[in-house]
Amino acid sequence: MKKYGAPQISSGDLLRDAVARGTELGLRAKAAMDAGELVSDELVLALIRERLSRPDALRGFILDGFPRNIAQAEALSDMLGRLGQPIDAVVLMNVDSAALLKRLTGRRTCSRCGRLFNVYTSPPTADTPCVDGRLEHQLVQRPDDNEDTIRNRLDVYAAQTRPLVEHYRGRGLLRTVEAEGDIEDVFARLERAVTPPAVRRSRKPRR
């Protein structure tokens, strides 16, 4: 996240990179990812631990998609405690299941420039040429962005990830953001949720 000078660390991206590179961890994770199941805590924690040790994460970071269950949350707290970097906030991006299904099944990535599109809500147009100047993007869909796999992921979320809501709410860390609507509106809600009130007041223009 350039605005905050902190790297966005996505557990999903770390896993997919490990799979693409054919590492030992990646090969062990591939079967579970293809089926829409949660990868074992051991594998995810190993990747996260390695990523947090890099210099750009020493002053702060944003974890995306992690933790996903209570065991991971407790292991993360232990890890960050040893690093002297306690959790500042936990954000729940709240989206209706039907809207989420449409968002994920419609997700496409241009294999040329890496830009993300959605065939339902934000398809490419002539005003969004590819990085090489072509008007056509080479759109590809992730193998796990199909309806059956996504529904299975939602079931796994209900069973294993939803308990985290109460886990972090009880610790006073949870911030809930309504994540439907325009990207700019959602980001504004997110900023309000994670910015302390005193900081928000100091940003208001003085008359």
What are these regions (language model features)?
Residues M1-R207:
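Glycine-rich phosphate-binding loop of ATP-dependent small-molecule kinases
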